[in-house]
């Protein structure tokens, strides 16, 4: 398959505040060089859940640019609490997770409604750990299973889970804020109780590898019905993690 390169164009004079336009502008401002492989694998006409490894604030804009559509990404609870960052979260259409003590019922309700409206949802299954700890481009944390539950419960006949590997070839790593300062906005987050600074990975050259989608439909659910919901969710989670791990190795 030929590797396709997608130039990042300057902000047009007719620039709108759509999440896709904001993403393109942010990538232009950052001067990132990116390429995409496997874009033709993204299904058309059905809701999608985009999942990916996650090390940088640039990941969501990159995924929107690669898929050429707005994607409503789940994000950490604290991001909806910080002045300035909160406004960016709203402009990008992100959906902050609920406060830990409240569970995630309200978040799942919003996400399921978005899928019912055929919107694209983005989930970073590794959680926040690779964002606050310094990692290597090919490192991968164990996936949480929330995205699989979301896909299984979506009130639609058919939905695709699309795994994407973000493979950084060249980057800068800066320190932006003391981790403990963030505990002011989310005291229950254990990652914010540690010493050190929140890193900020800025990609300079990156490839997005779009993997094989997993289509969840009536046939899929019926095939695994005897295994039970928990076993099916585990299998879907492991399948997507293995796909992204394989793509990251290919991109090294």
Positions of PLM-derived features:
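Generic beta-sheet signal
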Residues: 46-52, 119-125, 159
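Charged, low-complexity C-terminal accessory regions
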Residues: 203-205, 213-252
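A cross-family acyltransferase "interaction/gating" segment
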Residues: 135-224
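Catalytic-site beta-strand/loop segments enriched in glycine and acidic/polar residues
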Residues: 114-148
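A conditional alpha-helix N-cap/helix-loop micro-motif detector
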Residues: 32, 53, 78, 101-105, ...
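Helix-to-loop junction immediately C-terminal to a conserved catalytic motif
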Residues: 17, 22-54
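Alpha-helical membrane-targeting segments
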Residues: 4-31, 82-92, 174-203
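Catalytic core of membrane glycerolipid acyltransferases/transacylases, capturing the structured
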Residues: 44-102
């Amino acid at each position: 398959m030929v590797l396709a390169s997608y130039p990042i164009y300057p902000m047009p004079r007719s620039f709108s505040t759509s999440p896709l336009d904001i993403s393109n502008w942010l990538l232009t401002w950052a001067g990132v060089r990116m390429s995409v492989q496997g874009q033709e694998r993204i299904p058309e006409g059905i809701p999608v859940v985009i999942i990916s490894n996650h090390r940088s604030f640039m990941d969501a804009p990159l995924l929107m640019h690669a898929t050429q559509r707005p994607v409503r990404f789940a994000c950490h609870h604290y991001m909806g609490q910080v002045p300035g960052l909160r406004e960016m979260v709203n402009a990008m259409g992100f959906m902050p997770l609920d406060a830990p003590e409240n569970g995630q019922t309200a978040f799942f309700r919003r996400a399921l409604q978005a899928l019912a409206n055929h919107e694209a949802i983005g989930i970073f299954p590794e959680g926040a750990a690779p964002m606050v700890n310094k990692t290597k481009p090919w490192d991968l944390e164990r996936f949480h299973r929330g995205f699989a539950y979301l896909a299984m419960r979506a009130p639609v006949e058919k939905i695709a889970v699309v795994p994407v590997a973000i493979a950084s070839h060249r980057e800068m790593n800066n320190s932006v804020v003391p981790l403990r300062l963030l505990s002011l906005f989310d005291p229950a987050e254990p990652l914010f109780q540690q010493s050190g600074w929140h890193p900020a990975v800025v990609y300079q050259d990156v490839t997005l590898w779009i993997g094989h989608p997993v289509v969840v439909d009536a046939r899929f659910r019926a095939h695994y019905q005897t295994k039970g919901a928990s076993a099916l969710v585990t299998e879907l989670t492991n399948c997507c993690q293995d796909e992204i791990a394989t793509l990251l190795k290919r991109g090294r």
